[in-house]
Swiss-Prot record:
The record marks A18, E19 as: Reactive bond 3. InterPro entries: Bifunctional_prot_inhibitor, Kazal_dom, Kazal_dom_sf. SMART domains: KAZAL. This is Ovomucoid. It comes from Gallus varius (Green junglefowl). CDD domains: KAZAL_FS. One of its GO terms (molecular function) is serine-type endopeptidase inhibitor activity. The keyword Mitochondrion does not apply. Glycans are attached at N45. Avian ovomucoid consists of three homologous, tandem Kazal family inhibitory domains. GO terms for cellular component: extracellular space.
Length: 56
């Protein structure tokens, strides 16, 4: 089973587009899109990971 991951190397970004492509984080919180999720990953110092694509 391959780990689900997203490349957050280009983040953080100051502004996120309002695209609706939800991701579920390891904190059981739904993030609206990759940008919002990756900003949160950076803020968490890498402790936040992707649980799965789609809403939690």
């Amino acid at each position: 089973l391959a780990a689900v991951s997203v490349d957050c190397s280009e983040y953080p970004k100051p502004d996120c587009a309002a695209e609706d492509r939800p991701l579920c984080g390891s904190d059981n919180k739904t993030y609206g899109n990759k940008c919002n999720f990756c900003n949160a990953v950076v803020e968490s110092n890498g402790t936040l990971t992707l649980s799965h694509f789609g809403k939690c």
